[in-house]
Amino acid sequence: MSEPLLRGLAAGDPPSATGPVTGSADKVADVLIVGGGLVGGTLACALAEKGVSVVVIDGEDPEALLAAGYDGRCSAIALACQRLLDTIGLWDLLGGESQPILDIRVVDGGSPLFLHYAQAEAQGPMGYMVENRLLRQAILTRLGRLPAATLLAPARMTALRRDLDGVSATLSDGQTVRARLVVGADGRRSQVRESAGIGIRTLGYGQTAIVLTVEHERSHRGCAVEHFLPAGPFAILPMPGNRSSLVWTERSDLVPGLLALPAEHFQAELERRFGDHLGWVRPVGPRFSYRLTLQAANRYVDHRLALVGDAAHGMHPVAGQGMNYGLRDVAVLAERLVAAQRLGLDPGAPALLAEYEALRRPDNLLMLAITDALVRLFSNDIAPVALARRLGIGAVERMGPLKRLFMRHAMGTLKLGPEPPRLMRGVPL
């Protein structure tokens, strides 16, 4: 018996039930991935490298995605996730265009107290900053070299059907794709998630992030700085050369006015928050903005269906972990799908999908709770809260073991509970 299914997506029709998946298909694969962004593309590379056949459907034109002005964002890649990217052959394709994060300073407004994570304590980089555009390029290059991978882009899915034996997607050009499992990697407004009737919980913060790249007079020396201001965090993230990526969080009602400011007035607002520790500073390229919310799917799996990345969980960037937790999903799901393929097992088996959800959902929910608490704690200037917060920062700075625990968690190398997935330990599948 078939599941409730998604039809007429382009026309905005509600999901409707269909009959069994029948007939021939233009493309046949083990796994269909809807969404070829950073998380979906990485999953495709991890699977195809080991001979699991994948078809990736993405609605964006690859050429547009690689344009310097597409979205302006960068990602902080934790050390464990860098190991994943390296193990599946993506890291070398960046051509050295990444910036090691050697130090992290957390500052609470104008307080003299701060938290400093030093390279010496981490015994190496804590992570890396990478332009999303360059990571997309690496993914596209890698997919093009893997015979088991097929990318259909730009392509729009108009129907998704699931039955006892598999899934079938129909595209706007009439092509059909048949697979044994569909993975929704299609972001916060996931069509795959909606097709399964999986609900979401959303929390708003009344905050919007302004994202831009700046160049500055002095070297950042690989140091990432996060200032917690009353309106939200102001993060200065090191990029190659004398450049940094800014994630400037403001009240949403103020952002349109800031974005509309003439260059010299915007520069003044920027300098007021940035400070002079890197000498002069000036914007390079356009300004972008993104509304900040928390979003959590009520479940991650359904019949022959799994969700990864933002389709399953979307978090505030206060801790810089959104991309990393999507890659954790990739590591866990890829390990199980590759193992199933080697044993001749069904990649859409309920037990496999249940194990994926059991391993990932609690971890993601914990990080969602942590980021939510951080936003509410550090965006609160009520005197007793501010005092407790500053004392807490000072105390953690003086407590070496606790500070190192927080540092290892941010790096993705903290070992609590089950052993981390193979890819995050740098072990091939």
Swiss-Prot record:
Keywords of the record: FAD, Flavoprotein, Monooxygenase, Oxidoreductase, Ubiquinone biosynthesis
PROSITE patterns xrefs: UBIH
Catalytic reaction equation(s): a 2-(all-trans-polyprenyl)phenol + NADPH + O2 + H(+) = a 3-(all-trans-polyprenyl)benzene-1,2-diol + NADP(+) + H2O
GO BP terms: ubiquinone biosynthetic process
Cofactor dependence: FAD
Oxidoreductase found in the keyword field: yes
One Gene Ontology molecular-function label: monooxygenase activity
Enzyme class: oxidoreductase
Enzyme Commission code(s) on record: 1.14.13.-, 1.14.13.240
Role of this protein: Catalyzes the hydroxylation of two positions of the aromatic ring during ubiquinone biosynthesis.
Record protein name field: Ubiquinone hydroxylase UbiL
Organism: Rhodospirillum rubrum (strain ATCC 11170 / ATH 1.1.1 / DSM 467 / LMG 4362 / NCIMB 8255 / S1)
Gene for this chain: ubiL
